[in-house]
Amino acid sequence: MDESDLYRKWMRLVENLEREGIIKSEKVKRAFLRVPRYKFVSDRYKEYAHVDEPLPIPAGQTISAPHMVAIMLELAELEGGMNVLEVGAGSGWNAALIYELVKREVYTIERVSDLVEFARKNLERAGYKDKVHVIWGDGSKGYPPNAPYDRIIVTAGAPKVPEPLIEQLKVGGKLLIPVGSYHLWQELLEVIKLDEDNNTKIKNHGGVAFVPLIGEHGWRE
């Protein structure tokens, strides 16, 4: 399947997500059209990139289903110039979408070294080499060198909200994170930092299924 066929199928998926009310804003739609998922999966999975399901990536991990990525990006309410940290680089796809929404360098942190390399290669091929920085480290600790953040988006499920992530938010900043069980079921939480004492307001957006967040402030291996 050549790239024009892949892109036509991708456009149809984006239109379906918009019709279903999952993609709500023109800016998220525009980002999805600029950053098709097939550029961030292995060759054997490119023909399935338009299917609204998770797909395998290296190290036993997955690239999220497009509808889940769209839901989180809409909830994030990203604006131009925002400082954003992503926890869990995976394939690099979500970080590239974030860049398209904020038009500012994005930092994404990943603990699995094979995925660090996978994401970096994908981002370089897609034209984001100097726009998205993939850091190797424990994402449950955040990334203090570039804090404070307007938004932190976590793409793995935690047992509880990691305190370092709240500490690294700006007052008024937002954290999106799945919290719940180790496997298969969490609740997507929207956490707003209210003050410098790290008081928060939390909204529950319902059930989701993500791989576990492994780290000092996440799950143990």
Swiss-Prot record:
Keywords: Cytoplasm, Methyltransferase, S-adenosyl-L-methionine, Transferase. It comes from the Archaea. The keyword Transcription does not apply. Its EC number is 2.1.1.77. GO terms for biological process: methylation; protein modification process; protein repair. GO terms for molecular function: protein-L-isoaspartate (D-aspartate) O-methyltransferase activity. GO terms for cellular component: cytoplasm. PROSITE patterns: PCMT. It is found in: Cytoplasm. The keyword Disulfide bond does not apply. It holds the Pfam family PCMT. Belongs to the methyltransferase superfamily. L-isoaspartyl/D-aspartyl protein methyltransferase family. This is Protein-L-isoaspartate O-methyltransferase. It comes from Thermococcus sibiricus (strain DSM 12597 / MM 739).
